[in-house]
Curated annotation (Swiss-Prot):
Locations listed in the record: Cytoplasm
GO-annotated cellular components: cytosol
Species, as recorded: Pasteurella multocida (strain Pm70)
Gene: talA
Active site: K132 (schiff-base intermediate with substrate)
Keyword Repeat: no
Record's protein name: Transaldolase A
Catalytic activity: D-sedoheptulose 7-phosphate + D-glyceraldehyde 3-phosphate = D-erythrose 4-phosphate + beta-D-fructose 6-phosphate
Length: 317
């Protein structure tokens, strides 16, 4: 019997949104994505204790400065978890830059290069890694430079059409437009609490971005992310990639209902517009209250989890 997960795989690259090795083994995704929150939860799993110990030992060998040791340990732990995942997935791992660098182009570039160097030292080539960066103007500029240097990027926390357009114009490899967090905002800020999948504002956002990219011939991959229910996923069947948490992969695997392709583009390709200026980007992005609030909120939450991870690591030194 064909499951919905099998059907989805025939039209979309399925990615696992988790740092849990056992879940990745079970659902056999092409790629996997991590973020500071997922690294924090994964680091609490007993099978990862040795990865933490190794990261601490590495940090101690690199510096005598306690502040630098902590930075080195958290970077090495993220890469160690990525290395374990790469033993299972045939494709790429996404590893995220510290969210506290989201408004600093140069610091983001330097952190990305450090993460890449750690992977390279472990024998992993650049074509198996995506560096995740928040889709701020500064993050997009960092990604533009990194792409020129052969480091592919995954631009995350993407909520507005302005962010999506700026990413494509910068030539980034992949974007992760969020679905569920958009739905969360509309539920919290309107009287409407129930949305059918086709009218889900997060689904509508990703569909618009997908169609815009295809209409204008942009090569940037669209990978829908942050799902609250299976309906959001099935409504985006056909998207280039979808990154899905294990609980929702399980639901898809247990459902044998037919799955219809929802996203595809067969029309002619239009000319690309002139790239957005910084002023135009900020005007358009800031015209969308949801996008402004969710980008800032997402950065704050990832930064908070990075700090919790640091607090945990400090107890290990």
């Amino acid at each position: 019997m064909t499951t919905q997960l099998d059907s989805l795989r025939n039209m979309t690259v399925v990615v696992a949104d988790t740092g849990d090795i056992e879940a990745i083994k079970k659902y056999q995704p092409e790629d996997a994505t991590t973020n500071p929150s997922l690294i924090l939860s994964a680091s609490a799993l007993p099978q990862y204790a040795s990865l933490i110990d190794e990261a601490i030992a590495y940090a101690k060998s690199k510096s005598n400065c306690s502040k630098q040791q902590l930075i080195d340990a958290e970077d090495k732990l993220a890469v160690n978890i990525g290395l374990e995942i790469l033993k299972i997935v045939p494709g790429r791992i996404s590893t995220e830059v510290d969210a506290r660098l989201s408004y600093d182009t140069q610091a983001t570039i330097e952190k990305a290069k450090k993460l890449i160097a750690l992977y390279n030292e472990a024998g992993i080539s650049n074509d198996r890694i995506l560096i995740k960066i928040a889709s701020t103007w500064q993050g997009i500029r960092a990604a533009e430079e990194l792409e020129k240097q052969g480091i592919n990027c995954n631009l995350t926390l993407l909520f507005s059409e302005a962010q999506a357009r700026a990413c494509a114009e910068a030539g980034v490899y992949l974007i992760s437009p969020f679905v569920g967090r958009i739905l969360d905002w509309y539920k919290a800020n309107s009287d409407k609490k129930d949305y059918a999948p086709a009218e889900d504002p997060g689904v509508i956002s990703v569909t618009k971005i997908y169609n815009y990219y295809k209409q204008h011939g942009y090569n940037t991959i669209v990978m829908g992310a942050s799902f609250r229910n299976v309906g959001e996923i099935t409504e985006l069947a056909g998207c280039d990639r979808l990154t899905i948490a294990p609980a929702l992969l399980k639901e898809l695997q247990e459902n044998n209902a037919p799955l219809e392709r929802k996203l595809s583009y067969t029309g002619e390709v239009k000319a690309k517009p002139q790239p957005l200026t910084e002023a135009e980007f900020y005007w358009q992005h800031n015209s969308d209250a949801m996008a402004v609030e969710k980008l800032a909120d997402g950065i704050r939450k990832f930064a908070a989890d990075q700090e919790k991870l640091e607090a945990m690591l400090l107890t290990k030194f």
